UniProtKB/Swiss-Prot annotation:
This is Probable calcium-binding protein CML16. Residues 1-24 are annotated as: Disordered. InterPro entries: EF-hand-dom_pair (IPR011992), EF_Hand_1_Ca_BS (IPR018247), EF_hand_dom (IPR002048), EF_hand_pair_protein_CML-like (IPR039647). Ca(2+) 3 binds at residues 113, 115, 117, 119, 124. Keywords: Calcium, Metal-binding, Repeat. It comes from the Eukaryota. Ca(2+) 2 binds at residues 76, 78, 80, 87. Ca(2+) 1 binds at residues 36, 38, 40, 42, 47. PROSITE patterns: EF_HAND_1, EF_HAND_2. Ca(2+) 4 binds at residues 149, 151, 153, 155, 160. SUPFAM superfamilies: EF-hand. Residues 23-58, 63-98, 100-135, 136-171 form the EF-hand domain.
Length: 181
């Protein structure tokens, strides 16, 4: 039995959408659910804006609006004004070039590195998770940091963060394809 259903569109534009994610993609579904504040199964521009403001407030309202519009343009492939789970999962599964992937990882790292010192502490992790509604105790944050802290300094540097993100992407099937050169 197929894991997809066909969305009714004009013949040359028919697109298959996943009806359910594979168990390995449960993390993507969990993140999608956090973005989908009203639980209607799709992310609206206002929901996307709320999450981006919580993670990293823009320098100005107009800059934030442009950023959300650019993200919606990339994510909303069927142009219905919303991002559904299939579009969200497809975006996270797209292959990226090494330089682009490195830049995305650096940007993600910088969100958590609140003081900009090149290290993520348990306190910084707790602050960012709190902003997005993922309340964690100090002990939970310390455990998360310790699970990634290879050099034992009590913090997560960029290289440790990058290894953790690549490991997690591989575990969920979202890793970039290995180079064959």
């Amino acid at each position: 039995m197929s894991n997809t259903t066909e969305k009714k569109m004009p013949q040359q534009q028919q697109v298959e959408r996943p009806t359910a994610l594979a168990p390995a993609d449960a993390e993507i579904e969990r993140v999608f659910t956090r973005f989908d504040a009203d639980g209607d199964g799709r992310i609206s521009p206002s929901e996307l804006a709320a999450v981006t403001r919580a993670i990293a407030p823009p320098p100005s309202e107009s800059a934030g609006g442009r950023e959300v519009a650019a993200m919606m343009n990339e994510l909303d492939t069927d142009r219905d004004g919303f991002v559904d789970l299939g579009e969200f999962a497809a975006f996270h599964g797209r292959g990226r070039g090494d330089a682009e992937h490195e830049a995305e990882l650096r940007a993600a790292f910088d969100v958590y590195d609140v003081d900009g010192d090149g290290r993520i502490t348990a306190a910084e992790l707790g602050k960012v998770l709190g902003r997005i509604g993922e309340g964690c105790s100090a002990e939970e944050c310390e455990r998360m940091i310790a699970s990634v802290d290879v050099d034992g300094d009590g913090c997560v540097g960029f290289e440790e963060f990058k290894k953790m993100m690549c490991r997690d992407a591989a575990a969920t099937g979202g890793a970039d394809k290995a180079k064959t050169e």
